[in-house]
Every structure is written in C-alpha cells, then in structure tokens.
C-alpha cells in the first residue's frame, strides 16, 4: 500500500533529475518540456501559454507598429524568446516555488509587453504626431520612478531598459552587435559593456523616439555618465542632470540631494506645463510602502531554516518593480499578495525550496545580464540556495505620506541606494561590512562574488574579501563575468569556475551530474 502511495505521489509531483538532458547542445533549446508530475507540469504549461498570450496581445494592440518595430530594431525580435527565458528560471522547481517564480516572472513579462506597446505606438520614427510622446519624460534605466507619481498626466520612459538592459537578460546574443558598433565608433573595448552597449543602440538609432524632455544622472558610474552624451545627442531634447551624492551615508549631503530633486521637479514642470500633484504622489507612496512591507516579509522568511524564495527571480522581480512601478502600478501589489500567501503557507509546512539544500549563499556584486539564471543552475546542480543578493537589498526606506519635505528627503535617499549603486558607492562599509552583516543575518556559509572584469569597482578589495572570508570560515567563490558580453567570459566559463571550487576545495559531488558541463554558447 505504501508503495502505491509513493508511486501516486511521484506521478502527481516528482523530484527533478537529469535536467541537463532536457536541452539540445549549444542552442539550449528544450527537446521537450520538463515532466514535473501531473500537477506541476499542467501548471507550468498553463503559465507558458499565459506568457505567449501576453506577447500576442501586445502585437494585437498595435500590429502595424509591432511589425515596424521588428523590421527596424535589432533588439525587438529578442523578446520573442521570452518564454524560453522564463523556462530557464523555473527549471527544476516544484510546488509553491514553481508558482511563486511564475507569478514573479509574469510580473516582468506583462508590464514589459505594455511598455513595448507604448513605445512603438508613440515612436516618432513611425508616428510623427504621437499623442503621448510629448507627454513623456525620459529617464535613465536605474532611475527610481516614484517622483513621476506626482505627475499623473505624464509617463516616464526608462530609455535603455527595453532596447538593451532587459533585452540582454532575455537574449545573450543581442548585446555583442551593439558593442561592436560602439567600438567601431572609436570607444575603447575595455569600457563597461553596459554603457558601451547603450551607446551602440544610440549610434545605430535603435531607440524609439519618445519624450518631451529627459532626466539624466551620475548613476551608477562614470561610464554611464559618458554614455549620457550619446543618448542626449540622439534624442536632442531638453535634458536636466540630476546629481546624486556619492558619499551618501552622512546627513550633511542630504540638503544638497533634496535641492537636486526640487530642481528636477521644476524642470519637468517647465518643460511639460504640468504641476506636481502631492495628493497623487502620496497615494502612490502608500502603495509603495505596502509593497515594501511585503518585500521585507520575504526577506525575513529567507533568514529562517526554511527559505521559500531562492534562485534569480527574487532579485529580477525586485529590480524591475523598484525602478518601473514607483507605487503607481498596482499589479505588482496584487502579485505580492498572492506570492506572500503562497510563501507563508509553504513556510508553515516547512517546505523545502529545492531537492537538496546543502549551502546557504549570498550573491554579491553586479550579476551578469547574460546569465540571470545562474542561481537556478547553482541550486539544481550543486544544492546551493541563494537566500539573498546585492541587487535585492537596494533602498527599503518607507515614505512619510504626510510631510512633503520628509517625502522628498526619502526620495533623495532612495536614489542614492538604487541598483548597482547602494553597495558600490559611499565607501568601504557599504560593500564589505554590509556583506558580512547580511551573511550573519541570513546564516550563510557561502558567498558567490561576481568579478565584473570591465569594472574597477571591486578591484581594490579582492584581498580584503578573501582574508575576511577565511577568518569567518565562509566559502568564497569568485565568478568572473563581463556583465553584457558573453564572448569574453561565457556562461560555461562561469559555471566552470564554480565547478572547480565545489570539486577541489569542498570536494562535493553534484546533485545533478548532467548539469555540471554543457555548451550553451548559441543559446538565447
């Protein structure tokens, strides 16, 4: 009888195995969908259909503009591989973890299709008299959108997000052509690939022409500052520079930071004729605060012995809604309510988040855009659960929704703590001491440290990290990567660095040997 029960249980929901055999060599295309048991296979297939539905609906809303976009912009076709991108982040998942990840991923896919639709429908390349183009404010991709909640009659456009920043996560092959364009224009090849690729999009005229005016800033680094000149010349619209303090921990810089925010608001008002609406702003910040409470609840669960959100979708979802939503898009709040209910139910049942939970890891430094699913591979291949990462722990300061001056102070501090900035600016304490604080809080025994070879940010700290990790008895794995250029260091190279550490230093056997080594150089 017990044997029959066990058979039926596995038929309903099985454990992942031999995941490496699912994919074709080099291209990484699935030979067939993963069999997860009746329950999870049916749910996974249902969500796969939802992803395609969102893409088809996007095309149906503006079919002519969509076709023009496919014909005009190199990056546009990459989004057709979005279902495969979702598959990479759900591989090996079962039960609540599968459902949580799909909800998070749809929180990226659906809003992205809406943004693409908006850009193409109002692109002056295709529509000279666009209604919304002159009611749009262009901003940098790591700009935090809360301030636009005060302009309910305007929209913001994160200029580089759709054409290159998010696209490079979906399709690793899209960035190299733009990097080559920039280098052919005379820019050195050792520049960080992020601003270099963004400049390539501008040089190739692959940005949708939308926007009345633009806000640019000095984030996250000097490469991005230089890239702003290329984008400014391509759009040729009035541009305001928002300067964000680098040494941001001290309160002495905050009056200056608030003055910069006020100056930006005045610029938007002058260029668009709109006045800042405090009531609309505070209403959106109420949503922002509520969503932040859900976010912190996720973090608290991951500190326990039964974390429920591991892998990469944790930071991908956080990164996306943090910059895009600004408290204005209530869809994210609905997703968080569903996700947190699933999470708490699974936690109460002490559900394991993966087949084997051998190590609790913190991911530090900027991840490679071309390999966002590395954390999923770590979990499936080596039983390494990523319980927290640097890009998730960006600003989590709540807004005062009654005091205007305090609200502006919070926004200024939020800008100082955005993606690729909070822990890489402001001094030693923000990157080194903060790492060990998080390691202790999350009871981690391992750190995955990305070594972005085109960035000088971590270069001076290599020895310090290694020495302090050794003192604490923490397994510290350096993973070289080139952010957006898979030609320099491939996904396979990244995995090989981890494999060597796991087999030689820790002398462990893989959870799934079929995932140890495979070639995916031609994959999306």
Residue positions per predicted region:
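A charged, amphipathic alpha-helical module
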Residues: 2, 11-138, 262, 266-397, ...
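An N-terminal, globular interaction/scaffold subdomain
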Residues: 100-204
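Redox- and metal-dependent alpha/beta enzyme cores, enriched for Fe-S-associated oxidoreductases
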Residues: 132-133, 141-180, 365-436, 440
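Structural motif
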Residues: 138-143, 216-220, 363-368, 451-452
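Hydrophobic alpha/beta core scaffold segments
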Residues: 142, 372, 376-388, 403-414, ...
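Active-site and donor-binding regions of nucleotide-sugar-utilizing enzymes
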Residues: 163-254, 478-480
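Extended, charge-rich low-complexity interaction segments
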Residues: 193-205, 266-286, 413-436, 440, ...
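Cap/lid and interdomain-hinge subdomains that line or gate substrate/regulatory clefts
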Residues: 229-311, 506-524
């Amino acid at each position: 009888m017990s044997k029959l029960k066990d058979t039926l249980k596995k038929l309903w929901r099985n454990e992942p195995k031999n995941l490496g055999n699912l994919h074709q060599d080099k291209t990484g295309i699935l030979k067939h969908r993963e069999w997860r048991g009746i329950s999870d296979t049916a749910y996974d297939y249902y969500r796969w259909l939802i992803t395609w539905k969102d893409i088809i609906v996007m095309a149906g809303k503006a079919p002519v503009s969509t076709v023009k976009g496919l014909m005009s912009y190199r990056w546009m076709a990459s989004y057709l591989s979005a279902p495969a991108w979702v598959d990479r982040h759900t591989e090996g998942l079962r039960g609540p973890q599968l459902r949580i990840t799909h909800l998070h991923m749809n929180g990226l896919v659906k809003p992205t299709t809406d943004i693409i639709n908006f850009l193409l429908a109002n692109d002056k390349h295709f529509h000279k008299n666009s209604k919304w183009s002159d009611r749009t404010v262009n901003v940098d991709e790591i700009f935090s959108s809360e301030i636009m909640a005060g302009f309910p009659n305007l929209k913001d456009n994160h200029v580089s997000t759709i054409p290159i920043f998010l696209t490079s996560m979906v399709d690793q092959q899209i960035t190299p052509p733009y990097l080559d364009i920039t280098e052919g224009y005379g820019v050195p090849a050792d520049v960080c690939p992020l601003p270099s690729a963004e400049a390539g999009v501008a040089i190739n005229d692959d940005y949708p022409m939308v926007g009345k005016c633009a806000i640019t800033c000095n984030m996250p680094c000097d490469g991005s500052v230089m890239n702003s000149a290329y984008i400014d010349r391509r759009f040729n619209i009035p541009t305001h520079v928002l300067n964000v303090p680098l040494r941001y921990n001290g309160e002495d810089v905050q009056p200056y930071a608030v003055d910069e925010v006020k100056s930006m608001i005045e610029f938007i008002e002058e260029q668009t004729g709109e006045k800042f609406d405090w009531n609309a702003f505070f209403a959106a910040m109420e949503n922002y605060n509520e969503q932040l409470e859900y976010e912190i609840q996720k973090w608290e669960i991951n500190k326990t012995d039964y974390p429920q959100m591991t892998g990469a979708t944790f930071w991908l979802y956080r990164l996306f809604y943090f910059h895009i939503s600004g408290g204005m898009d209530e869809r994210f709040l609905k997703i968080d309510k569903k996700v947190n209910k699933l999470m708490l139910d699974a936690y109460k049942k002490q559900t394991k988040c993966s087949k084997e939970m051998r190590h609790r890891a913190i991911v530090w430094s900027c991840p490679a855009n071309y390999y966002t699913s590395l954390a999923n591979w770590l979990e499936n291949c080596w039983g390494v659960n990523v319980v927290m990462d640097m890009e998730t722990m960006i600003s989590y300061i709540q807004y005062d929704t009654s005091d205007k001056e305090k609200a502006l102070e919070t926004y200024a501090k939020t800008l100082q703590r955005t993606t690729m900035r909070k822990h890489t600016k402001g001094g030693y304490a923000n990157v080194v001491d903060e790492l060990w604080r998080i390691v202790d809080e999350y009871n981690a025994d391992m750190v995955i440290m990305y070594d972005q070879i085109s960035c000088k940010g971590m270069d001076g700290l290599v020895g310090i990290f290694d020495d302090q990790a050794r003192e604490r008895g923490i397994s510290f794995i350096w993973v070289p990567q080139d952010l957006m250029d898979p030609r320099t260091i491939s996904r396979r190279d990244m995995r090989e660095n981890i494999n060597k550490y796991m087999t030689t230093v820790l002398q462990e056997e893989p959870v799934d040997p079929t995932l140890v080594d495979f070639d995916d150089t031609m994959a999306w």
